[in-house]
A protein has these predicted regions:
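Carbohydrate-interacting/catalytic domains
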Residues: 2-170
Length: 170
């Protein structure tokens, strides 16, 4: 939830796997369910580092925390919409409940058009979500000439692979 628009949805202890056994009402319980197990901090350093990196990535990219709702259209005639949805094919999202795939491309040129943000153009950012229990592929959209996709390895599991754009699959 750190890379979605709006307020990041993270609760104390989430950064090291303190799940409260899935109980979303643990705040009103004065027992082990609601207590923070600080031992998890030393057991789950990898998750903590991942969360720290995700926070830094979000801070570095203003297009990921816009002060206004994204529209999904190219309302400033920049050549791309502010946000677009993708699936197994670039620019085509399957809305079937069995798909369980979502690719989102944010266009950073819109970040600099907002009055309350610094005047610095952000990157194209593509975030792929696979909610399926099996490995699935997403397609990358083409970028403008002279640009290419780069991956942030920190956010990829060892099973995932990524290819260059041009409708190729990741």
């Amino acid at each position: 939830m750190l890379l979605s628009q709006g307020v990041p949805m993270i609760y104390h202890g989430d950064e090291f796997g303190n799940s409260q056994s899935g109980n979303n009402n643990a705040y009103c319980q004065d027992n082990a369910t609601g207590w923070t197990d600080w031992k998890g901090l030393s057991r789950n350093q990898g998750l903590r580092e991942f969360v720290k990196d995700a926070i830094a990535f979000r801070k570095a990219h203003p297009v990921l925390h816009m002060p206004v709702e994204l529209k999904g259209v190219d309302y400033l005639t920049k050549g791309f919409p502010d946000v677009s949805l993708h699936g197994e094919r670039a620019w085509y999202l399957s809305y079937e409940n069995t798909s369980r795939l979502l690719g989102m491309m944010y266009y950073g040129a819109y970040a600099r058009e907002k009055e309350d943000l610094e005047a610095a153009e952000d990157d194209f950012i593509y975030i792929g979500y696979n909610f399926h229990w099996e490995n699935r592929s997403l397609a990358l959209p083409n970028l403008p000439e002279g640009m290419c996709w780069k991956k942030n390895r920190r956010y990829l599991s060892s099973r995932n692979r990524i290819l260059s754009g041009g409708g190729r699959r990741i």
